[in-house]
Amino acid sequence: MNNIIPIMSLLFKQLYSRQGKKDAIRIAAGLVILAVFEIGLIRQAGIDESVLRKTYIILALLLMNTYMVFLSVTSQWKESYMKLSCLLPISSRSFWLAQSVVLFVDTCLRRTLFFFILPLFLFGNGTLSGAQTLFWLGRFSFFTVYSIIFGVVLSNHFVKKKNLMFLLHAAIFACVCISAALMPAATIPLCAVHILWAVVIDFPVFLQAPPQQGKMHSFMRRSEFSFYKREWNRFISSKAMLLNYAVMAVFSGFFSFQMMNTGIFNQQVIYIVISALLLICSPIALLYSIEKNDRMLLITLPIKRKTMFWAKYRFYSGLLAGGFLLVVMIVGFISGRSISVLTFLQCIELLLAGAYIRLTADEKRPSFSWQTEQQLWSGFSKYRSYLFCLPLFLAILAGTAVSLAVIPIAGLVIVYYLQKQDGGFFDTSKRERLGS
């Protein structure tokens, strides 16, 4: 246990070795801006201390941290440094405890900052006493620690294909969530026992290389090579991409259905919101950035750029359109309200044009500054290509019928602008500027 600090230092260097102090300053500045923004939202919403006692607050904290840690750890196991870590004479328990701290700082803090700002804000305006503030900060901190450790346990069992243990820990977590809703007094003791189990029994055996890829991976390797199959192979084998896409599809459907039920948005706007939420899903849009390690090989092979681009576009647009159709069918079935033909065509145009723009933007300005996939998925740069899609949504203001003609024109103008930019995935002269 005495080597936790050196391991933690190495893990932080693995994430931030290229930028160093610049990354630290950028993260600190981002947290300050986020804190100011969230304080403004709390003030505008008039949130009081009664919100702290709501069950959904604890459940949101648990689920959010678990989801983010699960994505991070499953992506982490794909990195080469993890194979080296398995060979080094270091304590497995110390490694994963140190990794839990790194995950909190790098992945969870900015997503769950609200839970720590809220008690401090209420203390600042005199709503909470000092003792109450410490109580809520301690409570949220405890559940943060629990959810991170649980996420590490769940993701390791998933990666190592320990299905029985995966289901067992998932069942315990379900009991924790039920306890938080029905028996709050039993929640913390149950979490404490689960933490001890994870740290004492599971953590010491987690620093072992996972088994090789399964049958799907072998089938794809034996099949005739094509970039389209290659994208599907990557998507199926990448837990981060697969889970992020599934969660975003579920969230977009749930969020839109709630907005429709409360009457905040009308039916037409709801389906546009679904399109926007699906389009913001970034891991499946960074199909050139993810090729960083294979870039030089792809450049030297006799490959037509258009062949690669259209294969990636077919994959990406197919995922977006398929997800949209599924969400629309479920929302329409539950609400009993079907989507109009014009709105359906409008949303499909948004998705197809948005996919083309995001993919073109990623080809012309790929992000090669990452060292691990975890950095690519969690960095703010993943949303850069989404900004070019915003004019498409402005075109909606022209009305449904008119926007059907305006959206393709706006998309072509944006793509033309992007293609006129210097550099790109295949431009080796811009190698340093792209960060490769």
Swiss-Prot record:
- Kindly list the residue ranges recorded as spanning the membrane: 27-47, 55-75, 113-133, 134-154, 164-184, 187-207, 240-260, 270-290, 315-335, 395-415
Q: Does the keyword Transmembrane helix apply?
A: yes
Is the Cell membrane keyword given for this protein?
yes
Highest taxon of the lineage: Bacteria
Expression triggers: Transcription is highly induced by oxygen limitation and is under dual and independent control of Spo0A-AbrB and ResDE.
**Main localization of the protein?**
membrane
**UniProtKB keywords:** Antibiotic biosynthesis, Bacteriocin biosynthesis, Bacteriocin immunity, Cell membrane, Membrane, Transmembrane, Transmembrane helix
GO BP: bacteriocin biosynthetic process; bacteriocin immunity
Spell out the GO cellular component terms annotated for this protein, sorted alphabetically and separated by semicolons. Answer: plasma membrane
- Membrane topology of this protein: Multi-pass membrane protein
Subcellular location as annotated: Cell membrane
The record's function comment reads: Involved in the production of the bacteriocin subtilosin. Required for immunity to subtilosin.
This chain belongs to which protein, by name?
Answer: Antilisterial bacteriocin subtilosin biosynthesis protein AlbD
Q: Which gene encodes it?
A: albD
